[in-house]
C-alpha cells in the first residue's frame, strides 16, 4: 500500500471513529477539540518520544503543517461546492 493509500485509510478510520462518537452523543466541538489534542500528542510523540517535548521551532512547524492542511481541506471543499454550479451552467448552455 502506498503512503497516499495508507494516509487515506488512516484518515477514514479517524473519521469513522469520530462519527461513531458523534452518534453516541459526543458534541462536534468536543470531538474537534479531542482530535486536535490527539494530533498534538501524537505529533509530539512522533518527534520527541514518550518523554520529550517539541521546541518552539517544532511547535511552529507543527502549527504551520496543520494550517497548510486546513487550507487544503477548505480549498477542496470550495471546489466541490462549485462543481455543481459549473455543471448547472453547462446544462443551461445546452
Regions found by a protein language model. Name each.
Residues 1-94:
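Solvent-exposed interaction surfaces and binding hotspots enriched for charged
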Amino acid at each position: 500500500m502506498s503512503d497516499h493509500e495508507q494516509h487515506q485509510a488512516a484518515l477514514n478510520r479517524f473519521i469513522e471513529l469520530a462519527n461513531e462518537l458523534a452518534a453516541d452523543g459526543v458534541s462536534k466541538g468536543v470531538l474537534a477539540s479531542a482530535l486536535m489534542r490527539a494530533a498534538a500528542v501524537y505529533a509530539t510523540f512522533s518527534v520527541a518520544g514518550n518523554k520529550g517535548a517539541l521546541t518552539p521551532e517544532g511547535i511552529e512547524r507543527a502549527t504551520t503543517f496543520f494550517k497548510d492542511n486546513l487550507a487544503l481541506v477548505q480549498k477542496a471543499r470550495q471546489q466541490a461546492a462549485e462543481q455543481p454550479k459549473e455543471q448547472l451552467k453547462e446544462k443551461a448552455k445546452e
